[in-house]
Amino acid sequence: SRACGFTALEGAETISGKLSVSNYTQNDLITFPGIKSIGTYSQSGGKANGQTTVSFPDLEQVGTFQMSSCSYLKKLSAPKLTEVTDKWDTSYMQYVDEGDLELPLLRKIGVFKFWGGTYSGAASQMKLTGMADFAGVTEIGSVDIKYWGKMTDFSGLKNALPSLSADKWNVSGNGYNPTWEQITAGEYVKP
């Protein structure tokens, strides 16, 4: 297994601005050890086709976490991440499945934009069926979940529901699209 670390970042614990990764060809592990806080993390492109693990072994907080065109991603590991203060913005994670988003300590997300595909025609290519990887989250500012064609289980978000309201709940284009009334009535899973 090859690992791609960013030696220029060695010793850095805080990146207050933006850390951006794009158009890489790494197929195994991309890791950012030692970094505890990032203002904005942005990642896009790549040619790994569902073979890449992106790891933040020490990350505790990030302002904006953005990963677009994530067809390269197999797994995201951030075992110490507790908070995404501004926005979680991910899309096109066609190879990600249940358990591939390792976020056991994540408790708070500002804006939660979690798209499978980026349009309805791509929804059927997405594998993820549920939100269990977000079960520890207790506070979310707003939810926008779209284009996960096999997504039928939203029970992983039940701990965060008290922090939300009907106008902050937008779910569409998935295998199951519970309304605010359905989700607050405990109808987390497609009947």
Segments (PLM) and residue ranges:
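Concave beta-strand-loop units of leucine-rich repeat
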Residues: 1-11, 15-55, 61-191
